[in-house]
């Protein structure tokens, strides 16, 4: 590995898990080959996907290339940005963020630094594929939850390489996908799985229930609240949309308030 990566790994206050190391070696091999990497990294929340992404970006930086990390929401983008800045604070890598709410003056500076090559890593949302976003030397594109981005959106990002050569692609997902299904959905991607949690991390349980068991779910939430915990209910839509039959926050909030009346429950809404 490049000295930047070796130095960084030695500076970490923890060791990578066996699964992280295995996946990192696969990525490192891809980046060191003559072919363009196209790899999917799958792992539960907290399994350490971001660290693998940071190592990949650091390797690209050491070779003189820029990295962009595109997330589907501003909240997730800022979370990635905060973590990456924390990890790389002593490396000299300039990390920037660009979202739809970035103020004009700040946006102008971010775009200038990106085009001049001063920015090594940029994190953002769909704002990264706008026409005025120009890279100096994009070498690695990391996409979190690729299924939330359309084909055209992704291809617009690829076209931002000045020399016309597509960047290496690293896709991250926390969605549990059986390998056979992954081959169908992401047939063009090699698949790596981080199937081990760092020491001290509790495993994440993913449970799917049907609509008819919603009352059982509400009772489970009441039990968790009684135990001193909190519950977050996430909706794919904010308002009712006649074009798609998705649950929405507007009507869902009313339903939740009815199921969890005040007092003793306190229900808040944010979007």
Residue spans of the language-model regions?
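Inter-lobe coupling/hinge segments of SF2-like helicase ATPases
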Residues: 10, 14-25, 32-271
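Upstream accessory/linker segments immediately N-terminal to the RecA-like ATPase cores of bacterial MutS
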Residues: 1-12
